[in-house]
Amino acid sequence: MKLSCLLLTLAIIVVLTIVHAPNVEAKALADPESDAVGFADAVGEADPNAIIGLVSKGTCVLVKTVCKKVLKQG
């Protein structure tokens, strides 16, 4: 029972990490009347500390809830 709770917790952490991952936006910058030579620029704005804080807060709440339920059953 404890192993399944641990696996569930890890699965939820992975899902939260994927869902709240920062989006990267790629833009192609070129003049409409340009020659065959083009210019492309990829811009990404991400704050890794914000993701870590969000995931860690959610993980703490989840682990507390799971531990309380496991302790009540055991």
Swiss-Prot record:
Keyword Secreted recorded: yes
Keywords: Amidation, Antibiotic, Antimicrobial, Secreted, Signal
GO BP: defense response to bacterium
Signal peptide: 1-26
Residue list for modification Glutamine amide: Q73
Propiece span(s): 27-50
Domain of life: Eukaryota
Locations listed in the record: Secreted
Keyword Transmembrane applies: no
InterPro entries: Pilosulin
Summary of the tissues where the protein is detected: Expressed by the venom gland.
Chief location bin: secreted
GO CC field: extracellular region
UniProt function note: Shows moderate activity against E.coli and S.aureus (MIC<25 uM), slight activity against B.subtilis (MIC<50 uM), and no activity against L.garvieae, P.aeruginosa, C.albicans, and S.cerevisiae. Has no hemolytic nor cytolytic activity. Causes an IgE-independent histamine release.
Protein family membership: Belongs to the formicidae venom precursor-01 superfamily. Ant pilosulin family.
Protein name according to UniProt: M-myrmeciitoxin-Mb1a
Biological source species: Myrmecia banksi (Jack jumper ant)
